[in-house]
């Protein structure tokens, strides 16, 4: 298997340089008519993956929005990473803390 950088460069050559963030914060889930729980996280994230697969090379789930639901939220994050890979998307998990507010 090639390096992540090589796979990213190849995907960017084909699909361009965009990376879609997956930031399922409570107000956004509410806007989508989804509950602020692990089922809402899963529905939002999988719908996002379906919408962007084949359009962008990568997605970036924000770990904190999943972690706030405890171990069940982390399990959903793992599902999302696996589902993204199955759809041919590269994954960059955003797990930094304290750098900026929500963007």
Predicted regions and their residues:
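Active-site loop-to-helix "anion-binding N-cap" substructures in soluble metabolic enzymes
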Residues: 1-103
């Amino acid at each position: 298997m090639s390096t992540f950088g090589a796979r990213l460069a190849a995907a960017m050559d084909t699909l361009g340089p965009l990376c879609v963030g997956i930031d399922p914060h409570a107000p956004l889930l509410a806007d989508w008519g989804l509950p602020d729980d692990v089922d809402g996280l899963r529905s939002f994230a999988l719908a996002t993956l379906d919408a962007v697969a084949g359009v962008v090379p990568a997605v970036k789930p924000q770990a904190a929005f999943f972690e706030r639901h405890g171990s069940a939220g982390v399990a959903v994050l793992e599902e999302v990473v696996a589902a993204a890979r199955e759809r041919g998307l590269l994954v960059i998990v955003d797990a930094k803390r304290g750098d900026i507010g929500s963007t």
